[in-house]
Swiss-Prot record:
InterPro entries from the UniProt entry: 4-PPantetheinyl_Trfase_dom, 4-PPantetheinyl_Trfase_dom_sf, ACPS, Ppantetheine-prot_Trfase_dom
Gene3D superfamilies in the cross-refs: 4'-phosphopantetheinyl transferase domain
Entry-linked NCBIfam families: acpS, pantethn_trn
Single GO term (MF): holo-[acyl-carrier-protein] synthase activity
One GO BP: fatty acid biosynthetic process
Any matching Pfam family: ACPS
Gene expressing this chain: acpS
Cofactors that this protein relies on: Mg(2+)
Official protein name in the record: Holo-[acyl-carrier-protein] synthase
């Protein structure tokens, strides 16, 4: 069953301006150390950050809270499965909100799609609940 859907667009030029203006203060507030390591290794650094920014916004919408009610930027981390597929790992307030949305006997699955065209990036998040195996 689908629990939540969220989408967001971001502009890498805007992210680049925020990095220029605020530097580490912006990066530390929004991105996890793992996300920073990955982005800082990429040639298209601002685009990498922009995709992750959009993913976090989309996830917060799918959670039904936006970036409020105890859900913070760094509670959501874009990670890759062994296959390379992106997904989100939630901690803190985002993880608590997700747990509150999932019915007993079910477990959450977060589906993330990222795309970009030039400086524009988009992210789509679908949070679903599937029956736990062995229950």
């Amino acid at each position: 069953m689908i629990i939540g859907i969220g989408s967001d667009f971001s502009d890498a030029r805007r992210i680049a301006r925020s990095i220029e203006r605020f530097g580490d203060r912006f990066l530390d507030r929004v991105f996890t150390p793992g996300e920073r390591r990955k982005a800082d290794q990429r040639k298209l650094r601002a685009e990498t950050y922009a995709k992750r920014f959009a993913a976090k916004e989309a996830c917060s919408k799918a959670l039904g809270t936006g970036l409020s009610h105890g859900v913070f930027w760094r509670d959501m981390e874009v990670v890759n499965l062994p296959s390379g597929q992106p997904t989100l790992m939630l901690t803190g307030g985002a993880a608590r909100r997700l747990a509150a949305l999932v019915p007993d006997g079910y477990e959450p699955h977060i589906h993330l799609s990222l795309t970009d065209e030039g400086p524009l990036t988009a992210a789509y998040v679908i949070i679903s609940a599937v029956p736990k195996t062995g229950v």
